[in-house]
From Swiss-Prot:
UniProt-annotated stretches for the region Imidazoleglycerol-phosphate dehydratase: 169-375
EC number of the protein: 3.1.3.15, 4.2.1.19
UniProt pathway annotation: Amino-acid biosynthesis; L-histidine biosynthesis; L-histidine from 5-phospho-alpha-D-ribose 1-diphosphate: step 6/9; Amino-acid biosynthesis; L-histidine biosynthesis; L-histidine from 5-phospho-alpha-D-ribose 1-diphosphate: step 8/9
Catalytic residue positions: 8 (nucleophile), 10 (proton donor)
Region (Histidinol-phosphatase): 1-168
Gene that specifies this protein: hisB
Catalytic activity: D-erythro-1-(imidazol-4-yl)glycerol 3-phosphate = 3-(imidazol-4-yl)-2-oxopropyl phosphate + H2O; L-histidinol phosphate + H2O = L-histidinol + phosphate
GO BP term (any one): L-histidine biosynthetic process
Protein name (Swiss-Prot/TrEMBL): Histidine biosynthesis bifunctional protein HisB
Keyword vocabulary terms for this entry: Amino-acid biosynthesis, Cytoplasm, Histidine biosynthesis, Hydrolase, Lyase, Magnesium, Metal-binding, Multifunctional enzyme
């Protein structure tokens, strides 16, 4: 799905003159900061649509020819800098006409409201007047009013681009079945913290390792049919957590994508190069994790456990949890562990995954890390 920034023209893309008509080339001036802001938003995956009221356009007081020349030059300037508008929607009515197509009315938006490929949750409206904010409210999207001497406002283009392109990656998932009721709240850019309650204290402790060592904020509340056994609770928690990660990542622009973290220290942990992933020791145990947010879920596990359970967590459900996480998140994960102490082995698996996640989730600009154009 594609997010769209709907943009007013006069006073937002170009400076508005005292007579409120840009009908001559000498009146054409770009608003400060608009080009770098739109480039940043473009690189973050946004499309652009101009929505503008042009009072009486085509009438004797505002001839079409007087509008066309400066408007074409404006579009050419933006195009020369790599900024292309998906559409230019113009209402030509007078304010007294109360036309439904005139902002803040949304009559010009019928085709867009029927488009199922628009990401409305991330879309926004940018303008310089209160009517632009009302237009945004009517569309149920976020509105930004540029700061101008004529109409006030609180925003500049740099702040708008930062807010939209660098928005925190958050998600809330509620998974409710006849067997479990699970709520996951995740913030991939939040301060590392965990609040976990699943009814399985050892499992809670393992999930806390993900939040701590991946550097994310994670809240999980799970109520399951533990009177039967632990399977449904652990499996569905993995599915809900994976769904939340996938949702928070959005279109994955700018992420590292891969989690492998090759050794960068002056010494090398034994076996790290051979495993090719993030490798960590825990006493006699060593675990390695390498992952890819490819959108193609796959899980490979190498390791064995001697004990039937560690604490209240069956060891057979350790790889099953990771498989569920991969299935729901679209992640490819290769995880291996060897050692003597099963507690250490389970905990090392969760910590190795978390450290690989930390690298894969990091932002590096806004470029999509794929030649296919989608992940």
């Amino acid at each position: 799905m594609t997010p769209i920034v709907f943009i007013d023209r006069d006073g937002t893309l170009i400076e508005e003159p005292p007579d409120f008509q840009i009908d001559a080339y000498e009146k054409l001036r770009l608003v400060n900061g608009v080009i770098p802001a739109l480039l940043k938003l473009r690189d973050a995956g946004y499309h652009f649509v101009i929505v503008t009221n042009q009072d009486g356009l085509g009438s004797p007081t505002y001839p079409q020819a007087s509008f066309d020349g400066p408007n074409a030059l404006m579009l050419q300037i933006f195009s020369s800098q790599g900024i292309v508008f998906r559409d230019v929607l113009i209402d030509r009515s007078w304010p007294a006409d109360n036309a439904p197509t005139r902002k803040p009315g949304i009559g010009l938006m019928v085709a867009y409201l029927q488009d199922r490929d628009i990401d409305w949750a991330r879309s926004a409206m940018v303008g310089d007047r209160p009517t632009d904010l009302q237009f945004a409210e009517n569309l149920n999207i976020r509105g930004f009013q540029l700061r101008t001497p004529q109409f006030g406002g609180d925003w500049d283009w740099d702040g708008i681009a930062h807010t939209l392109a660098d928005a925190p990656r958050r998600a809330v998932v509620q998974r409710h079945t006849k067997e479990t009721n699970i709520r996951v709240e995740i913030d991939l850019d939040g301060a590392p913290q965990a609040r976990i309650t699943t009814g399985l204290p050892f499992f809670d402790h393992m999930l806390e390792q993900i939040a701590k060592h991946a550097g994310i904020s994670l809240h999980i509340s799970a109520v399951g049919d533990l009177h039967i056994d632990e399977h449904h609770t652990i499996e569905d928690t993995g599915l809900a957590l994976g769904q939340a990660v996938r949702q928070a990542l959005g279109d994955k622009r700018g992420i590292g994508r891969y989690g492998f973290d090759p050794p960068q220290l002056p010494w090398q942990v034994s076996g790290a190069a051979a495993h090719g992933g993030f490798t960590l020791p825990m006493d006699e145990t060593q675990a390695s994790a390498v992952l890819d947010f490819s959108g193609r879920p796959y899980f490979v596990f190498e390791g064995t456990f001697v004990r039937e359970r560690v604490g209240d967590m069956p060891t057979e459900l350790v790889p099953h949890f990771f498989r569920s996480l991969c299935d729901a998140s679209g992640m490819n994960l290769h995880l291996s562990v060897h050692g003597d102490n099963d507690h250490h082995k389970v905990e090392a698996c969760f910590k190795a995954l978390a450290r690989a996640l930390r690298q894969a989730l990091q932002r590096h600009g806004h470029v999509l890390p794929s030649t296919k154009g989608a992940l």
